[in-house]
Protein backbone atom coordinates (compact mmCIF):
# COMPACT_ATOMS: atom_id res chain seq x y z
CA UNK A 1 0.00 0.00 0.00
CA UNK A 2 1.73 3.25 -1.11
CA UNK A 3 1.69 5.97 1.54
CA UNK A 4 1.67 9.64 0.56
CA UNK A 5 2.37 12.59 2.82
CA UNK A 6 0.73 15.81 1.61
CA UNK A 7 2.44 18.98 2.85
CA UNK A 8 0.21 21.97 2.16
CA UNK A 9 -0.55 24.91 4.39
CA UNK A 10 -1.89 28.42 4.63
CA UNK A 11 -4.22 29.65 1.91
CA UNK A 12 -6.85 28.08 -0.30
CA UNK A 13 -4.44 28.49 -3.20
CA UNK A 14 -2.18 25.93 -1.54
CA UNK A 15 -4.83 23.72 0.04
CA UNK A 16 -7.51 23.22 -2.61
CA UNK A 17 -5.14 21.84 -5.29
CA UNK A 18 -3.60 19.51 -2.72
CA UNK A 19 -7.03 18.32 -1.59
CA UNK A 20 -8.01 17.69 -5.21
CA UNK A 21 -4.97 15.47 -5.73
CA UNK A 22 -5.48 13.62 -2.46
CA UNK A 23 -9.14 13.01 -3.31
CA UNK A 24 -8.18 11.70 -6.76
CA UNK A 25 -5.92 9.01 -5.35
CA UNK A 26 -7.69 5.66 -5.30
CA UNK A 27 -7.10 2.52 -3.31
CA UNK A 28 -4.64 1.27 -2.28
CA UNK A 29 -3.15 4.72 -1.60
CA UNK A 30 -3.05 5.94 1.98
CA UNK A 31 -2.81 9.70 2.57
CA UNK A 32 -1.59 11.67 5.57
CA UNK A 33 -1.32 15.45 5.85
CA UNK A 34 1.19 17.74 7.51
CA UNK A 35 0.44 21.41 8.06
CA UNK A 36 0.96 24.33 10.42
CA UNK A 37 -1.05 25.07 13.60
CA UNK A 38 -3.80 27.70 13.42
CA UNK A 39 -3.90 27.80 9.63
CA UNK A 40 -6.71 27.00 7.19
CA UNK A 41 -5.78 23.32 6.98
CA UNK A 42 -6.81 22.78 10.59
CA UNK A 43 -10.44 23.36 9.55
CA UNK A 44 -10.40 21.84 6.05
CA UNK A 45 -8.36 18.65 6.46
CA UNK A 46 -9.50 16.86 9.67
CA UNK A 47 -12.29 14.42 8.94
CA UNK A 48 -10.85 13.79 5.49
CA UNK A 49 -7.23 12.91 6.22
CA UNK A 50 -5.12 12.43 9.35
CA UNK A 51 -3.45 15.78 10.07
CA UNK A 52 -0.20 16.43 11.90
CA UNK A 53 0.77 20.03 12.59
CA UNK A 54 4.33 21.28 12.85
CA UNK A 55 5.42 24.80 13.74
CA UNK A 56 7.00 26.37 10.66
CA UNK A 57 7.49 29.87 9.28
CA UNK A 58 9.01 31.82 6.43
CA UNK A 59 12.57 33.01 5.87
CA UNK A 60 11.95 36.70 5.27
CA UNK A 61 13.85 38.16 8.19
CA UNK A 62 17.45 39.24 8.74
CA UNK A 63 20.06 38.82 11.44
CA UNK A 64 18.85 37.19 14.63
CA UNK A 65 15.32 36.77 13.29
CA UNK A 66 16.57 34.83 10.28
CA UNK A 67 18.77 32.67 12.51
CA UNK A 68 15.73 31.79 14.62
CA UNK A 69 13.75 30.97 11.49
CA UNK A 70 16.55 28.69 10.25
CA UNK A 71 16.53 26.86 13.58
CA UNK A 72 12.74 26.47 13.30
CA UNK A 73 13.16 25.16 9.75
CA UNK A 74 15.62 22.49 10.88
CA UNK A 75 13.40 21.56 13.83
CA UNK A 76 10.36 21.28 11.55
CA UNK A 77 12.35 19.17 9.09
CA UNK A 78 13.34 16.86 11.92
CA UNK A 79 9.73 16.50 13.06
CA UNK A 80 8.56 15.68 9.53
CA UNK A 81 11.45 13.24 9.08
CA UNK A 82 10.31 11.35 12.17
CA UNK A 83 6.73 11.37 10.85
CA UNK A 84 7.90 9.95 7.51
CA UNK A 85 9.83 7.19 9.25
CA UNK A 86 7.09 6.37 11.76
CA UNK A 87 4.34 6.18 9.14
CA UNK A 88 6.62 4.57 6.52
CA UNK A 89 5.78 7.26 3.97
CA UNK A 90 6.73 6.43 0.37
CA UNK A 91 6.46 9.90 -1.23
CA UNK A 92 5.76 13.55 -0.39
CA UNK A 93 3.58 15.96 -2.38
CA UNK A 94 3.60 19.66 -1.57
CA UNK A 95 1.89 22.72 -3.02
CA UNK A 96 3.73 25.29 -0.96
CA UNK A 97 3.11 27.36 2.12
CA UNK A 98 5.33 27.49 5.19
CA UNK A 99 5.33 23.71 5.50
CA UNK A 100 6.80 23.10 2.03
CA UNK A 101 10.47 23.82 2.79
CA UNK A 102 10.81 21.51 5.83
CA UNK A 103 8.80 18.80 4.03
CA UNK A 104 11.10 18.90 0.99
CA UNK A 105 14.21 18.75 3.17
CA UNK A 106 12.78 15.90 5.25
CA UNK A 107 11.90 13.88 2.14
CA UNK A 108 15.39 14.40 0.78
CA UNK A 109 16.82 13.44 4.16
CA UNK A 110 14.83 10.18 4.08
CA UNK A 111 15.67 9.44 0.45
CA UNK A 112 12.06 9.31 -0.80
CA UNK A 113 10.55 11.05 -3.86
CA UNK A 114 9.08 14.52 -3.44
CA UNK A 115 6.89 16.37 -5.94
CA UNK A 116 6.42 20.13 -5.62
CA UNK A 117 3.55 21.85 -7.43
CA UNK A 118 4.12 25.48 -8.43
CA UNK A 119 0.91 27.15 -9.56
CA UNK A 120 2.20 30.65 -10.42
CA UNK A 121 3.82 31.82 -13.64
CA UNK A 122 6.73 33.19 -11.60
CA UNK A 123 8.05 30.49 -9.24
CA UNK A 124 7.88 31.33 -5.57
CA UNK A 125 10.75 31.48 -3.12
CA UNK A 126 10.51 27.83 -2.05
CA UNK A 127 10.48 26.65 -5.67
CA UNK A 128 13.47 28.80 -6.57
CA UNK A 129 15.52 27.70 -3.58
CA UNK A 130 14.49 24.07 -3.13
CA UNK A 131 13.11 22.96 -6.50
CA UNK A 132 16.48 21.42 -7.31
CA UNK A 133 16.05 19.07 -4.34
CA UNK A 134 12.70 17.76 -5.63
CA UNK A 135 12.24 14.68 -7.76
CA UNK A 136 9.86 16.64 -9.99
CA UNK A 137 8.43 20.15 -10.03
CA UNK A 138 4.95 20.28 -11.54
CA UNK A 139 3.80 23.65 -12.87
CA UNK A 140 0.32 25.00 -13.39
CA UNK A 141 1.26 27.42 -16.17
CA UNK A 142 3.59 26.63 -19.04
CA UNK A 143 5.27 30.02 -18.63
CA UNK A 144 6.74 28.86 -15.30
CA UNK A 145 8.70 25.92 -16.72
CA UNK A 146 11.61 27.89 -18.26
CA UNK A 147 11.96 29.86 -15.02
CA UNK A 148 12.70 26.76 -12.93
CA UNK A 149 16.39 25.89 -12.77
CA UNK A 150 18.19 22.74 -11.68
CA UNK A 151 15.26 20.33 -11.84
CA UNK A 152 12.85 18.72 -14.26
CA UNK A 153 9.62 20.71 -14.65
CA UNK A 154 6.42 19.02 -15.83
CA UNK A 155 3.38 21.01 -16.99
CA UNK A 156 0.26 19.58 -15.33
CA UNK A 157 -2.07 22.53 -14.78
CA UNK A 158 -3.45 23.43 -11.36
CA UNK A 159 -6.16 21.18 -9.88
CA UNK A 160 -9.49 22.74 -8.91
CA UNK A 161 -12.31 21.56 -6.68
CA UNK A 162 -14.58 18.93 -8.21
CA UNK A 163 -17.55 21.32 -8.15
CA UNK A 164 -15.92 23.41 -10.87
CA UNK A 165 -15.96 20.40 -13.20
CA UNK A 166 -19.67 19.69 -12.70
CA UNK A 167 -22.52 21.78 -14.09
CA UNK A 168 -24.03 23.89 -11.30
CA UNK A 169 -27.39 25.62 -11.02
CA UNK A 170 -27.45 29.36 -10.49
CA UNK A 171 -28.09 30.08 -6.78
CA UNK A 172 -31.56 31.41 -6.05
CA UNK A 173 -30.13 34.41 -4.17
CA UNK A 174 -28.54 35.79 -7.35
CA UNK A 175 -30.54 38.77 -8.71
CA UNK A 176 -33.09 37.73 -11.30
CA UNK A 177 -33.55 39.50 -14.62
CA UNK A 178 -32.69 39.45 -18.30
CA UNK A 179 -29.55 41.58 -18.04
CA UNK A 180 -26.00 40.21 -18.06
CA UNK A 181 -24.47 38.87 -14.85
CA UNK A 182 -21.25 40.47 -13.58
CA UNK A 183 -19.43 38.64 -10.78
CA UNK A 184 -16.80 40.58 -8.83
CA UNK A 185 -14.48 38.55 -6.63
CA UNK A 186 -12.62 40.85 -4.28
CA UNK A 187 -10.81 38.10 -2.43
CA UNK A 188 -9.50 38.19 1.11
CA UNK A 189 -6.12 39.70 0.19
CA UNK A 190 -6.03 43.27 -1.00
CA UNK A 191 -9.79 43.43 -1.55
CA UNK A 192 -10.38 47.07 -0.64
CA UNK A 193 -8.60 48.60 -3.62
CA UNK A 194 -10.43 46.38 -6.08
CA UNK A 195 -13.76 46.87 -4.33
CA UNK A 196 -13.49 50.65 -4.48
CA UNK A 197 -12.61 50.55 -8.17
CA UNK A 198 -15.55 48.36 -9.06
CA UNK A 199 -18.13 50.23 -6.98
CA UNK A 200 -17.60 53.27 -9.19
CA UNK A 201 -19.06 51.20 -12.05
CA UNK A 202 -22.10 49.88 -10.26
CA UNK A 203 -24.61 52.77 -10.53
CA UNK A 204 -24.44 53.05 -14.33
CA UNK A 205 -24.39 49.27 -14.84
CA UNK A 206 -27.31 48.69 -12.49
CA UNK A 207 -29.40 51.40 -14.12
CA UNK A 208 -28.84 49.62 -17.45
CA UNK A 209 -30.15 46.31 -16.09
CA UNK A 210 -26.86 44.56 -15.33
CA UNK A 211 -27.07 42.07 -12.46
CA UNK A 212 -24.10 42.16 -10.08
CA UNK A 213 -22.82 39.74 -7.45
CA UNK A 214 -19.98 41.28 -5.44
CA UNK A 215 -17.95 39.02 -3.15
CA UNK A 216 -16.25 41.70 -1.09
CA UNK A 217 -14.00 39.72 1.22
CA UNK A 218 -14.04 40.49 4.93
CA UNK A 219 -13.75 43.87 6.65
CA UNK A 220 -14.97 46.04 3.78
CA UNK A 221 -16.26 49.26 5.40
CA UNK A 222 -18.22 50.27 2.29
CA UNK A 223 -20.56 47.28 2.17
CA UNK A 224 -24.13 48.51 1.86
CA UNK A 225 -23.28 51.95 0.53
CA UNK A 226 -25.09 51.06 -2.72
CA UNK A 227 -28.51 49.42 -2.48
CA UNK A 228 -30.25 48.09 -5.57
CA UNK A 229 -32.44 45.03 -6.28
CA UNK A 230 -29.97 43.88 -8.96
CA UNK A 231 -26.98 43.99 -6.58
CA UNK A 232 -26.02 41.36 -4.01
CA UNK A 233 -22.97 41.84 -1.77
CA UNK A 234 -21.55 38.99 0.29
CA UNK A 235 -18.20 38.60 2.05
CA UNK A 236 -17.67 35.10 0.62
CA UNK A 237 -19.60 32.32 -1.07
CA UNK A 238 -19.24 28.55 -1.28
CA UNK A 239 -21.04 28.71 -4.62
CA UNK A 240 -18.31 30.31 -6.70
CA UNK A 241 -18.36 27.39 -9.21
CA UNK A 242 -22.00 28.17 -10.04
CA UNK A 243 -21.39 31.91 -10.15
CA UNK A 244 -18.47 31.62 -12.57
CA UNK A 245 -20.26 29.12 -14.81
CA UNK A 246 -23.22 31.49 -15.22
CA UNK A 247 -21.37 34.83 -15.26
CA UNK A 248 -21.22 36.80 -18.48
CA UNK A 249 -18.12 38.54 -17.14
CA UNK A 250 -16.00 38.38 -14.00
CA UNK A 251 -13.68 40.89 -12.38
CA UNK A 252 -11.04 39.17 -10.27
CA UNK A 253 -7.56 39.23 -8.84
CA UNK A 254 -5.03 37.11 -10.73
CA UNK A 255 -3.96 34.57 -8.14
CA UNK A 256 -3.09 31.20 -9.65
CA UNK A 257 -5.97 29.43 -7.92
CA UNK A 258 -8.51 32.00 -9.07
CA UNK A 259 -7.15 31.91 -12.61
CA UNK A 260 -7.44 28.11 -12.71
CA UNK A 261 -11.05 28.27 -11.53
CA UNK A 262 -11.92 30.94 -14.08
CA UNK A 263 -10.25 28.90 -16.81
CA UNK A 264 -12.08 25.61 -16.25
CA UNK A 265 -15.31 27.62 -15.96
CA UNK A 266 -14.66 29.38 -19.27
CA UNK A 267 -15.44 32.78 -17.73
CA UNK A 268 -14.41 35.93 -19.63
CA UNK A 269 -12.56 38.05 -17.12
CA UNK A 270 -11.10 41.43 -16.34
CA UNK A 271 -8.02 40.65 -14.24
CA UNK A 272 -6.81 43.24 -11.73
CA UNK A 273 -3.50 41.90 -10.34
CA UNK A 274 -2.83 42.50 -6.66
CA UNK A 275 -0.03 45.11 -6.82
CA UNK A 276 1.67 43.96 -3.60
CA UNK A 277 1.89 40.27 -4.59
CA UNK A 278 5.35 38.78 -4.08
CA UNK A 279 7.54 39.10 -7.19
CA UNK A 280 4.47 40.62 -8.91
CA UNK A 281 3.49 37.06 -9.74
CA UNK A 282 -0.15 38.04 -10.27
CA UNK A 283 0.91 40.30 -13.12
CA UNK A 284 2.68 37.36 -14.75
CA UNK A 285 -0.34 35.09 -14.21
CA UNK A 286 -2.61 37.68 -15.81
CA UNK A 287 -0.33 37.99 -18.83
CA UNK A 288 -0.74 34.25 -19.48
CA UNK A 289 -4.50 34.74 -19.85
CA UNK A 290 -4.32 38.03 -21.72
CA UNK A 291 -1.80 36.61 -24.20
CA UNK A 292 -4.43 34.18 -25.52
CA UNK A 293 -7.22 36.79 -25.43
CA UNK A 294 -8.98 35.04 -22.53
CA UNK A 295 -8.83 38.10 -20.27
CA UNK A 296 -8.18 41.82 -20.22
CA UNK A 297 -5.72 43.24 -17.69
CA UNK A 298 -6.55 46.44 -15.82
CA UNK A 299 -4.00 47.53 -13.25
CA UNK A 300 -5.32 48.80 -9.95
CA UNK A 301 -6.00 52.52 -10.14
CA UNK A 302 -7.71 55.34 -8.28
CA UNK A 303 -11.50 54.90 -8.31
CA UNK A 304 -11.85 58.25 -10.06
CA UNK A 305 -10.03 56.97 -13.15
CA UNK A 306 -12.10 55.45 -15.95
CA UNK A 307 -9.94 52.57 -17.25
CA UNK A 308 -11.90 49.80 -15.54
CA UNK A 309 -15.25 51.41 -16.36
CA UNK A 310 -14.35 51.81 -20.04
CA UNK A 311 -13.13 48.20 -20.22
CA UNK A 312 -16.22 46.69 -18.61
CA UNK A 313 -18.58 48.73 -20.77
CA UNK A 314 -16.66 47.69 -23.90
CA UNK A 315 -16.98 44.02 -22.96
CA UNK A 316 -20.58 44.05 -21.69
CA UNK A 317 -21.96 46.77 -23.95
CA UNK A 318 -23.43 44.39 -26.53
CA UNK A 319 -25.62 42.87 -23.80
CA UNK A 320 -26.91 46.19 -22.47
CA UNK A 321 -29.59 48.50 -23.91
CA UNK A 322 -28.39 50.31 -27.00
CA UNK A 323 -25.42 48.01 -27.53
CA UNK A 324 -24.53 46.26 -30.79
CA UNK A 325 -25.24 42.52 -30.39
CA UNK A 326 -22.85 41.79 -33.24
CA UNK A 327 -19.91 43.34 -31.36
CA UNK A 328 -19.76 40.79 -28.54
CA UNK A 329 -16.21 39.68 -27.60
CA UNK A 330 -17.33 37.51 -24.68
CA UNK A 331 -17.89 34.15 -26.47
CA UNK A 332 -14.38 34.14 -27.94
CA UNK A 333 -12.89 35.19 -24.60
CA UNK A 334 -14.78 32.40 -22.85
CA UNK A 335 -13.53 29.82 -25.33
CA UNK A 336 -9.95 31.03 -24.98
CA UNK A 337 -10.25 30.94 -21.20
CA UNK A 338 -11.55 27.37 -21.29
CA UNK A 339 -8.64 26.31 -23.50
CA UNK A 340 -6.27 27.75 -20.89
CA UNK A 341 -7.74 25.44 -18.23
CA UNK A 342 -6.64 21.88 -17.52
CA UNK A 343 -9.63 19.88 -16.31
CA UNK A 344 -7.64 16.73 -15.52
CA UNK A 345 -4.75 18.40 -13.67
CA UNK A 346 -5.39 16.24 -10.61
CA UNK A 347 -5.15 13.06 -12.69
CA UNK A 348 -1.92 14.26 -14.31
CA UNK A 349 -0.42 14.70 -10.85
CA UNK A 350 -1.70 11.31 -9.70
CA UNK A 351 -0.08 9.70 -12.74
CA UNK A 352 3.15 11.53 -11.95
CA UNK A 353 3.15 10.29 -8.36
CA UNK A 354 2.32 6.73 -9.37
CA UNK A 355 5.12 6.76 -11.94
CA UNK A 356 7.69 7.67 -9.31
CA UNK A 357 6.83 4.61 -7.23
CA UNK A 358 6.61 2.06 -10.04
Curated annotation (Swiss-Prot):
Point out the signal peptide segment. Answer: none
Subcellular location(s): the record lists: Cell inner membrane
| Major location category of this protein | membrane
Instruction: Name the keywords, alphabetized.
Output: Cell cycle, Cell division, Cell inner membrane, Cell membrane, Cell shape, Cell wall biogenesis/degradation, Glycosyltransferase, Membrane, Peptidoglycan synthesis, Transferase
Which cystines does this chain contain?
none
- Its Gene Ontology molecular function terms? UDP-N-acetyl-D-glucosamine:N-acetylmuramoyl-L-alanyl-D-glutamyl-meso-2,6-diaminopimelyl-D-alanyl-D-alanine-diphosphoundecaprenol 4-beta-N-acetylglucosaminlytransferase activity; undecaprenyldiphospho-muramoylpentapeptide beta-N-acetylglucosaminyltransferase activity
Q: SUPFAM superfamilies from the entry?
A: UDP-Glycosyltransferase/glycogen phosphorylase
* Any one cellular-component term (Gene Ontology): plasma membrane
Query: Which protein family is it in?
Result: Belongs to the glycosyltransferase 28 family. MurG subfamily.
The protein here is known as UDP-N-acetylglucosamine--N-acetylmuramyl-(pentapeptide) pyrophosphoryl-undecaprenol N-acetylglucosamine transferase
Q: Which organism is it from?
A: Synechococcus sp. (strain CC9311)
